[in-house]
Amino acid sequence: MSQPITRENFNEWMIPVYAPAPFIPVRGEGSRLWDQQGKEYIDFAGGIAVNALGHAHPELREALNEQASKFWHTGNGYTNEPVLRLAKKLIDATFADRVFFCNSGAEANEAALKLARKFAHDRYGSHKSGIVAFKNAFHGRTLFTVSAGGQPAYSQDFAPLPPDIRHAAYNDINSASALIDDATCAVIVEPIQGEGGVVPASNAFLQDLRELCDRHNALLIFDEVQTGVGRTGELYAYMHYGVTPDLLTTAKALGGGFPVGALLATEECARVMTVGTHGTTYGGNPLASAVAGKVLELINTPEMLNGVKQRHDWFVERLNTLNHRYGLFSEVRGLGLLIGCVLNADYAGQAKQISQEAAKAGVMVLIAGGNVVRFAPALNVSEEEVTTGLDRFAAACEHFVSRGSS
């Protein structure tokens, strides 16, 4: 008989790059999770904007099981039907002409940055290698993507870092304009900075970035790893802004909990990537592709996307009511079901403590830095689940405030 698994085993056996919650989830259904002791949680964290259709969605399980009964993997020496169907769905639904599949958002961003460098080198020469990114961004944990992220806390211990990456202030076109020039090969930007505090870009900022990239023959990359696949109420956030990138990265919700990532590209950009210039062993495997194809089928409908906008209103209305009572937040911001509650000055730096109180009360939330409590629930979360979860969150806020004043 195997020994019982406990949270303490994590501290004994795992490389300690995470500090997970004190409880271990063991079962999920929809927007609810249960831990080893049977305690129920309403899940407003969504696996960090991954579980777009909640836990154990029956149609995703069916898609996975059906493919699992056929074959799992062949490697990139062969293609498969599920990945080709998935590619066509993404092409039909977006600006893209071609797709590269991988396993995560970091891999998708790595591929985008490599493509941008090669595109510039092939067309203009090796001097055109500069990448402009933004402070407080997050693009992944590879050495290339963590360097683009603009958060020294994630990169300072891994020097020397890749060169020719500079960081402008987000939503500040003058700051960006000072860095973008004819030696710039790409600008990479999140339409909403997720890890950086749930900060939406302004329309003018993204439009001006598009114009600057066109003027200097640089590619515009939208990192939609967190904002993509219905999260904002459009299939991809660029559709809100009327600004079309040259490259777009997507992952997280694309697999609904199954690891998958993708780089979407125009034909002009894609043609520089020839056989052997990039690759991955597992990318586009039939299991991931079958699940992602079903995710897109379920999410890319007017009913689902309009429902996200409606659910945004449910959350914002109730969070504002809660805030009127407890006075924790200076702002509630975001698009669709990516929502950030910004702590006011009296509670600065205490987002983690609030998230811990929330878990005790039976609701799971995220943070985005020390000052923002973040919500990224399933896109199909019910009104009853929203009400129950936010009632629990209100109880957590009440306990947090009373504890601080006692």
Curated annotation (Swiss-Prot):
GO terms for biological process: alpha-amino acid biosynthetic process; arginine catabolic process to glutamate; arginine catabolic process to succinate; ornithine catabolic process. Pathway: Amino-acid degradation; L-arginine degradation via AST pathway; L-glutamate and succinate from L-arginine: step 3/5. PANTHER family: AMINOTRANSFERASE CLASS III, SUCCINYLORNITHINE TRANSAMINASE. InterPro entries: Ac/SucOrn_transaminase_bac (IPR017652), AcOrn/SuccOrn_fam (IPR004636), Aminotrans_3 (IPR005814), Aminotrans_3_PPA_site (IPR049704), Class-III_PLP-dep_AT (IPR050103), PyrdxlP-dep_Trfase (IPR015424), PyrdxlP-dep_Trfase_major (IPR015421), PyrdxlP-dep_Trfase_small (IPR015422). It catalyses: N(2)-succinyl-L-ornithine + 2-oxoglutarate = N-succinyl-L-glutamate 5-semialdehyde + L-glutamate. The modification N6-(pyridoxal phosphate)lysine is found at K252. NCBIfam families: arg_catab_astC (TIGR03246), argD (TIGR00707), PRK01278.1 (NF002325), PRK05093.1 (NF003468), PRK12381.1 (NF009047). GO terms for molecular function: identical protein binding; pyridoxal phosphate binding; succinylornithine transaminase activity. Catalyzes the transamination of N(2)-succinylornithine and alpha-ketoglutarate into N(2)-succinylglutamate semialdehyde and glutamate. Can also act as an acetylornithine aminotransferase. This is Succinylornithine transaminase. Keywords: Aminotransferase, Arginine metabolism, Pyridoxal phosphate, Transferase. Its cofactor is pyridoxal 5'-phosphate. The gene is astC. It comes from Escherichia coli (strain 55989 / EAEC). It holds the Pfam family Aminotran_3. Its EC number is 2.6.1.81.
